[in-house]
Amino acid sequence: VTSLYQVVSLLFVNNGASWSSFDSTPGVKWREASPQPNPDSNSPESSNFREGTLLLDGFGMVDVPDGNQGAEAGVKKINEGESGLTLNGDAQNVHSIAVKKFYVSPEYADVVRRQLPVASTVRLIAGDCGGNIAGGPDTQTKFYEIGIKDHQLFLEAYIDDGEGSRGPGYTTFLFTKVNPDKRIKELQCKEL
């Protein structure tokens, strides 16, 4: 069982996924001991956050920026599956899980399937979005419905190719229990 599966399966809890239920998730290293106030949010459902790291299965070693600036800048080797993890929620419960990995992996469904049990389903529900912040068409953002046992989750996946930052780019996977209809309409995506 992968670390990502163990984290997203906690969203299935009937009475809500309490912050403390994530405390001892195998394979997750938390940066904070508890949720922190989110000053960037104006939504009650993301008024708190907690960050950590986990390793996605099925990736090898790659070069990434070492974090230094200017003449000191260099690269270091890490497993491409090393990913940042952010939980977002209200004061009591987690409502969404974001996973951000270095490097562009546009085959979103394949990456997610490697992390979930064999019986899981990953079904594309929207893509070919009409607009992004830069004003052009967004061919990269995709939305999925994920079925695991008798439970349903939704996934928004997108990439940033690193253009302009000279970095390797990254891929973000955002898991929620709530259907992202509003977000799909906002991005003018074609529903399937």
Spell out what each predicted region is.
Residues V1-N88:
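N-terminal leader/targeting segments
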Residues F22, L87, I97, Y144-I146, ...:
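Hydrophobic beta-strand residues in large extracellular and virion-surface proteins
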Residues G58-T141:
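Long, charged/polar, surface-exposed segments that mediate recognition or autoinhibition
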Residues G89-N93, F102-P106, K149-D150, D160-E163, ...:
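Short, flexible beta-strand-to-coil junctions
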Residues A126-E163:
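Short aromatic loop motif centered on NTY/YTY
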